[in-house]
Amino acid sequence: MDPAASSCMRSLQPPAPVWGCLRNPHSEGNGASGLPHYPPTPFSFHQKADFPATATAAYPDFSASCLAATPHSLPQEERIFTEQHPAFPQSPNWHFPVSEARRRPNSGPAGGSKETRTSSLGLVDTTGGPGEDCGVLGSTANETEKKSSRRRKESSDNQENRGKPEGSSKARKERTAFTKEQLRELEAEFAHHNYLTRLRRYEIAVNLDLSERQVKVWFQNRRMKWKRVKGGQPISPNGQDPEDGDSAASPSSE
């Protein structure tokens, strides 16, 4: 028997290259992941009669042993375990579904929050638009009311200012409408006497159905007119109208 074959039979573990081939292809990651690796399958030697004939016949068929270590060659229970717990850590894509799943729910609320933000913004815009319009309309209405009130005040002030001269002119225009008979009697009396006594003024007022004031005012106006036309008489030495003195002296004056 070949010494190399006997040493291989005596040792439970094959040489380093043989042991690396028999191990799981993903066994390098077992050290990092901490998962146990499956024991290698026993060697299968080809028993030949002419063993020393060829040197290669003494070595086992490593291809079969390496294929036996694959998950497809393992028993069903071990295959399920390897499928559930792979020995070699997967690529970063293995974490992608989890991160994607985490991102998806996060993106859902984020998207929802964005949608809610946009919807809230939309609601604010839709509700704020008419609110602003109402505020603008209210301000314009207040401005129009203020302007109208100012215009009313100005118009009322103008009317009052206009009404005052009109009232004064009306008061001035309110003159006694003497009849022809009254004017005839007054002219005849003025031709005889430019100044009237208190008693004579009272008699004329009673006869013509006038007041003493009306008679007095008429005679004053008539004297002013006569002075403008004729030059009139000189003023009395006392510098006072005789009617005024008479009326002031009489107790029955106005």
UniProtKB/Swiss-Prot annotation:
PROSITE patterns: HOMEOBOX_1, HOMEOBOX_2. CDD domains: homeodomain (cd00086). Pfam families: Homeodomain. Residues 87-178, 227-254 are annotated as: Disordered. It is found in: Nucleus; Cytoplasm. GO terms for molecular function: DNA-binding transcription factor activity; DNA-binding transcription factor activity, RNA polymerase II-specific; RNA polymerase II cis-regulatory region sequence-specific DNA binding; sequence-specific DNA binding. GO terms for cellular component: cytoplasm; nucleus. One of its GO terms (biological process) is positive regulation of transcription by RNA polymerase II. Residues 171-230 bind DNA. Residues 154-178 have a biased composition (Basic and acidic residues). Keywords: Activator, Cytoplasm, Developmental protein, DNA-binding, Homeobox, Nucleus, Repressor, Transcription, Transcription regulation. The keyword Transcription regulation applies. Its main location: nucleus. It comes from the Eukaryota. Mesodermal transcription factor that plays a key role in somitogenesis and is specifically required for sclerotome development. Required for maintenance of the sclerotome polarity and formation of the cranio-cervical joints. Binds specifically to the promoter of target genes and regulates their expression. Activates expression of NKX3-2 in the sclerotome. Activates expression of CDKN1A and CDKN2A in endothelial cells, acting as a regulator of vascular cell proliferation. While it activates CDKN1A in a DNA-dependent manner, it activates CDKN2A in a DNA-independent manner. This is Homeobox protein MOX-1. The lineage of its organism: Eukaryota, Metazoa, Chordata, Craniata, Vertebrata.
